[in-house]
Amino acid sequence: MGIKDLAISYVVFSTIHFFLFALALTTIGLYGTDLHNANKQGKYSDSKWVYAVVVGSISAVTCVLYFIPFVLRVAGFVVAIWDFILFVLWIALFGVFGKMYINEDAEGDGGVKRMKNAVWVDLASALLWLIATLAALGYWWKHRDNRSKFTGRAHV
């Protein structure tokens, strides 16, 4: 089985999820840095940063599962629902940190600059999860088994 034998839809979904995986790992790194520094100094871990790392981790695990060829095909409509849930989680993350950092003046502070960049990574992830949701819905709609309701034999 070579690359030519793969369906174009699988290649597109895998490409989208590869970029989502990269963005999830980036998010974990950007927010995890502050969590690590707070832990090293004996301070508490802010729940907003923990939420960001959890959302990034859930997204990364989801992407790894989606790299298995049959998962996207077998899961069907569930994939679209789960992708939408992840979209909502990412939008919430963008909203929380966007409110905190978009209008913040960095004034040479590297931590604030990093968090301002993290906000845009969050938005990119959210939008890409929305695209993945719409693509999964389109794939499900096109490939669903639409047989007649009465006998179940005829394709409608």
Show the residue positions of the predicted features.
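Membrane-interface helix-loop junction between the first two transmembrane segments
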Residues: 31-42
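Membrane-interfacial segments
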Residues: 39, 71, 102-105, 141-147
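Signature of small four-pass
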Residues: 13-27, 31, 48-101, 122-139
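Individual transmembrane alpha-helices with interfacial aromatic-anchor signatures
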Residues: 109-127
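Juxtamembrane loop segments immediately following a transmembrane helix
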Residues: 93-115
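Intrinsically disordered terminal tails
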Residues: 1-11, 110-113, 131-156
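Non-cytosolic membrane-interface motifs at loop->transmembrane helix junctions
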Residues: 43-47, 78-79, 109-115
